[in-house]
Amino acid sequence: MAITYSSKPSKQRKALFNMPLHLRHKLFNAPLSKELREKYGVKKLPVRKGDVVRIMRGDWKGHEGKVVRIDLRRVRLYVEGVQRKKADQTPVYYPIHPSKVMIIKLDLSDKWRRKIIERRKGLIESEVVEEKETSKTSEGGGKTIEETEGEK
């Protein structure tokens, strides 16, 4: 996903920091677990409140929990059970970057999210069908399988 057309790091960072919130949501993509990937046919989806995630990197690696809150401004999410204590012993959630988690259970209570999954699944299936069709025609020297069988 190109944030800007410039290759300069300073302009890349500037575009990231000044990105509007409705576009910043795209930065929350996280991979799905193997089971979910096979079930829905999608590799990545944006993390939402209510999803269950597994932390894959950092001090909290291996922890699983429900996403409690998402901070679009800081591009961080907060997971249930991942907390630190402040000096006065009050617990606060530890911020985690969405690229460091894997979604293990989706919250499909939103009909729009189901539509997104269906749309992405359809794109993937159509790409697979196109690849199969091109491989069939390339094997027979530009002829389809039916044409080559008719010549025999």
Swiss-Prot record:
Entry keyword annotation includes Ribosomal protein: yes
Gene Ontology annotations of biological process type: translation
Matching CDD domains: KOW_RPL26 (cd06089)
UniProt-annotated stretches for the region Disordered: 128-152
Domain of life (superkingdom): Archaea
InterPro entries: KOW (IPR005824), Rib_uL2_dom2 (IPR014722), Ribosomal_uL24_CS (IPR005825), Ribosomal_uL24_euk/arc (IPR005756), Ribosomal_uL24_KOW (IPR041988), Translation_prot_SH3-like_sf (IPR008991)
GO CC annotation: large ribosomal subunit
Stretches of the chain forming a coiled coil according to its record: none
Alphabetical UniProt keywords: Ribonucleoprotein, Ribosomal protein, RNA-binding, rRNA-binding
First and last residue of the signal peptide: none
A Pfam family the protein falls into: KOW
UniProt keyword annotation of Iron-sulfur present: no
Assembly and binders: Part of the 50S ribosomal subunit.
Function: One of two assembly initiator proteins, it binds directly to the 5'-end of the 23S rRNA, where it nucleates assembly of the 50S subunit. Located at the polypeptide exit tunnel on the outside of the subunit.
Similarity comment: family membership: Belongs to the universal ribosomal protein uL24 family.
HAMAP family: Ribosomal_uL24_A (MF_01326_A)
Protein name, per record: Large ribosomal subunit protein uL24
Record organism: Staphylothermus marinus (strain ATCC 43588 / DSM 3639 / JCM 9404 / F1)
Gene it is expressed from: rpl24
